[in-house]
Amino acid sequence: MLAKLKSQFYSLIKGLGYNVTDNAEYRENFPWLMIRTNGYQSVNSFNLNVSSATLALDIFSTYPGEKEIIEIVEDIGSHLMELKDSNPDVLFCYQKTVKILDDKSTGPVRKHGVVVYEFLLGYGVAPVEEVPEVEPEN
């Protein structure tokens, strides 16, 4: 379930034309984005399976301000519902937080955006059987 969601999230971002990966290997082509799993919980019962997935998207930019990261966040956000529409297991999704930091670890100051997305997934829901009405005896 989580692997399918991450794959579809990756495809969505790649389809928008961004350089995206799921590993922390340094890239020369900016901006580049990295998808991370930030949390996953699953609740299973005899007739319902529900999971909560939190994905983090790191955005690395050489733009001197925050504009490029904000535009990327808005672009992805405007297409986020495509994930829900293309995957019937996605019941709900939203952008939870956005933080933009200065990344000084690579020499010159670069901008590093961290965007957190929450997904509620449900699958294997058993149909509810109707119980016939019973007339009370006199």
Regions found by a protein language model. Give the residues of each.
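Short, glycine-/polar-rich solvent-exposed loops and beta-turns at beta-strand/coil boundaries
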Residues: 25-27
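Short, well-ordered secondary-structure micro-motifs within conserved domains or adaptor modules
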Residues: 29-37
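Charged, amphipathic alpha-helical segments and their flanking helix caps
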Residues: 1-23, 36-138
